[in-house]
Amino acid sequence: MACGSSLGSVDMNSIPLVALNYNVRHRLSLYLNPNAVVAAGWTQLAEEMGYDYLEIKNFERFPDCTMKLLEDWEKKCFRATVGGLLEMLKKMERNDILTDLGPLIEADCMKHLEKKNAPLPLQDDKVDSSEQYRITKSDDPSGSLPETFDAFICYCAQDISFVQEMISRLEQTDYKLKLCVFDRDVLPGTCLWSITSELIEHRCRKMVVIISDDYLDSSECDFQTKFALSLGPGAREKRLIPVKYKPMKRPFPSILRFITLCDYTNPCTKGWFWERLAKALSR
């Protein structure tokens, strides 16, 4: 996907797409919705965002394709920023949009920064305002920049040693991936089910499911897996990656049999295991 950019005095790469208000989004639609022969439109923008043919065709059923595309992109891509959008428009050679809407976009970004940096309102000293926003250790207390991850790791306590190996292999190497490990990253005192749902659906691009005999007995793992599978049929295969790291005595879970397995127990492919997994989490 595209990287960030800058406009005037504002670093657009640090501004999430949510900063763009309705007026700017509507004007983008006026530029991109028409099927012009000489200018790239919303379908080219969707391709730059990483959508495939069937996903793009599905957007055609909405009356405002560009508006729906922007909404979907900022939900699915945690790196969706104003800078990323500008870079894609530049790559599409839509300099007319950058010129005409540049001041409006910069104004929206300035408003976002002012709101973010504004002092928090006074409240009861017994209530910490950060509590309603922070669910992970590195969350922004203001709630404007929630912590995001490359992958949520679904595991049971008995498999923690393999989770620790994943951390050393994927985070502390050149792959530099960011994993969401519940016992390490999530703050205590939060509702288990709602926080897990938030992390899987909105904070993590992928989910790695560590399959073992102990996994089959875990109600938490069962919930996490079924929740991830429920998040839209078109995203299942892209989102969830089953990993088998040791031999099992019990049958492999049937709900995961249709997804390609990353098998650490296969001696023929073990040498490629970490590279395959890292690339699957990076794409």
Curated annotation (Swiss-Prot):
The keyword Transcription does not apply. GO terms for biological process: inflammatory response; innate immune response; MyD88-dependent toll-like receptor signaling pathway; positive regulation of canonical NF-kappaB signal transduction. Residues 147-281 form the TIR domain. Residues 27-105 form the Death domain. One of its GO terms (molecular function) is TIR domain binding. One of its GO terms (cellular component) is cytoplasm. Pfam families: Death, TIR_2. Residues 106-143 are annotated as: Intermediate domain. SMART domains: DEATH (SM00005), TIR (SM00255). The keyword Iron does not apply. Residues 120-143 are annotated as: Disordered. InterPro entries: DEATH-like_dom_sf, Death_dom, MyD88_Death, Myelin_different_resp_MyD88, TIR_dom, Toll_tir_struct_dom_sf. Residues 120-140 have a biased composition (Basic and acidic residues). It comes from the Eukaryota. Signal peptide: none annotated. Keywords: Cytoplasm, Immunity, Inflammatory response, Innate immunity. It is found in: Cytoplasm. The intermediate domain (ID) is required for the phosphorylation and activation of IRAK. Adapter protein involved in the Toll-like receptor and IL-1 receptor signaling pathway in the innate immune response. This is Myeloid differentiation primary response protein MyD88. It comes from Xenopus tropicalis (Western clawed frog).
